[in-house]
Amino acid sequence: MIKINIVEPIRDKEKVKEIYNYLSNKNKRDALLFYFGVYSGLRISDILKFKVKDCYKKGYNIRETKTNKQKIVDWNPYLARALRDYISDKDPEEYLFKSRQCNKSITRQRAYQIIKKACNECKVYNVGTHTLRKTFGYHTYLITKDVAMLMDIFNHSSPDITLRYIGISQEKNNQTIKKLKY
């Protein structure tokens, strides 16, 4: 039997804060990695490409690895503040999420380990690197209810794909099933 890992968004905002605080007390780089993911909605492969010099402006310009599409986006104010604090004493050519071994970025596998451990410590399960992106999408949807905007951000081809990706479809299905009574 094949085991399928289902990766979920973090639906509870208090848990998002708890995980960030946990990471902040352990390692500033790792806390920023978490914040970057939940506030940008970028894939981990794109997040890990950032260098310190990419964070000096009021937003970012990136060509997404998976889609090869260009994106120009303003920083979220909370992320911008965290970035300013973190990069103040860093070399502009350094990777933002620098590995301890050399001037390379941490790997996707290391990012996964960081996120998984922090979430498990805070009793949040079914997580992976996509959890950050899905968390961004989930909470953005709850605020805006704008599926078209999220489709554009995520480069999805249909509303159904986006809603399923951010965990809204399953949540609605579960609520409906619980209400069923004969």
Outline where the language-model segments fall.
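Conserved catalytic core of the tyrosine transesterase superfamily
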Residues: 1-182
